[in-house]
A protein has these predicted regions:
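Generic beta-sheet signal
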Residues: 45-47, 155-164
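N-terminal secretory signal peptides and thylakoid transit peptides that target proteins
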Residues: 2-14
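Bacterial N-terminal signal peptides
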Residues: 13-22
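Sec/Tat signal peptide C-region and signal peptidase I cleavage site
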Residues: 24-28
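A short, acidic, amphipathic alpha-helical segment used as a generic capping/interface helix at domain edges
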Residues: 144-154
């Protein structure tokens, strides 16, 4: 129940303008098709924000103060692990260059990155779910940190990947992400200190995008 209340609060705050939303409307400059999206990502210059892969829905984080206690966390299920691998394989098949990868400190986010085959991975509190175990000010700080990462241009010729959690994504981006699914990617282009959403992709769709790139 506390998690539901928090999400409802996030939506209410967004509606009242208390959360900073994407500086342009969702899909204001969408990429038109799979081939165009693959081409855009091959050129680099994007930030790919991913909610961690599929998990066991009947499990919870029982030691949320200790992200290193993997056994006490809601971890990836077999489908989540398989899709994380296919996500990384699809990016490589499509020739998408991945540079820096930032993840939550929780294992379900970090494992999504490692199974995808990413190498330059850094865990950060900025992407870690705080929920009710950190202060509202800290949750707000993390939301702002996520927005700053979205607005930061990657190293030339690469794309940055961020792997986080639903509450963090809602806090940072608002009510349009209230139904963000496990494994879903929101792809942004940093632009003049802001960020433009160009596509939202489910993890099951990446092999199709890779095929279109050929």
């Amino acid at each position: 129940m506390p998690a539901i209340s928090r999400r409802n609060l996030a939506v209410f705050a967004a509606a009242c303008g208390l959360l900073a939303l994407v500086p342009v409307s969702a899909l204001a400059q969408p990429v038109g098709d799979d081939k165009a999206l693959a081409a855009a990502l091959r050129a680099g210059g994007h930030v790919i924000l991913v909610r961690h892969g599929a998990t066991f829905p009947d499990r919870a984080d029982t030691d949320p103060f200790n992200p290193d206690n993997i056994a006490a966390q809601r971890n990836l299920n077999d489908n989540g692990k398989a899709l994380a691998k296919s996500f990384g394989e699809a990016l490589r098949q499509a020739g998408v260059p991945v540079g820096k990868v930032y993840t939550s400190r929780f294992n379900r986010a970090y494992e999504t990155a490692t199974l995808a085959g990413f190498t330059d991975i850094e865990k950060t509190a900025d992407l870690t779910e705080g929920g009710l175990v950190v202060s509202p000010n800290e949750n707000n700080r993390r939301a702002e940190a996520l927005r700053q990462l979205l607005a930061t241009a990657p190293k030339a010729g690469t794309n940055t990947v961020l792997i986080s959690h639903k509450p963090n994504i809602i806090d940072a981006l608002g009510k349009d992400w209230f139904e963000v699914k496990e494994g879903e990617a929101s792809i942004f282009r940093p632009e003049n200190g802001k960020y433009v959403l160009i596509a939202r992709v489910q993890m099951t769709d990446w092999p199709r995008i890779a095929a279109a790139a050929k």
